[in-house]
C-alpha cells in the first residue's frame, strides 16, 4: 500500500519528536483507491512511555496535522484500539511513516 498524498517527512519527524510519538502511521482511505479531494487523513500513533497526552493535546495535534497536510485529520492511539475488529482492520492496513 502506498499513500495517495505527498508526505512532508521532515515536518512529520519534527511533529513526532515534539509530541513524543514513537510511531506515526497512516490508514484508511489515504492508502486506498477511494481517497478523494474531500477525504480526511486517518493517523494511528504510538506515544513514548513518558508521553501522557490528554484530549486537549490530541485536538491540538489534529490542528497541527491539518496545517501540515491541508486536510482534516483524525488521530487514533494504537493503545486505545480496544474493539478487536476495528483494531485488526487498522493494524493490518497501516503505512508507517515514522518510527523512532
Roles of regions detected by a PLM:
Residues 39-41:
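Short, conserved active-site loops that position catalytic residues or coordinate cofactors/metal ions
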Residues 1-25, 31-33, 37, 48-100:
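Catalytic core of pol beta-like nucleotidyltransferases
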Amino acid at each position: 500500500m502506498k499513500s495517495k498524498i505527498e508526505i512532508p517527512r521532515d515536518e512529520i519527524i519534527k511533529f513526532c519528536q515534539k509530541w513524543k510519538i514513537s510511531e506515526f502511521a497512516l490508514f484508511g482511505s489515504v492508502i486506498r483507491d477511494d481517497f478523494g479531494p474531500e477525504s480526511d487523513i486517518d493517523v494511528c500513533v504510538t506515544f513514548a512511555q513518558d508521553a501522557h497526552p490528554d484530549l486537549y493535546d490530541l485536538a491540538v495535534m489534529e490542528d497541527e496535522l491539518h496545517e501540515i497536510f491541508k486536510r482534516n485529520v483524525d488521530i487514533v492511539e494504537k493503545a486505545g484500539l480496544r474493539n478487536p475488529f476495528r483494531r485488526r482492520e487498522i493494524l493490518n492496513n497501516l503505512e508507517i511513516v515514522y518510527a523512532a
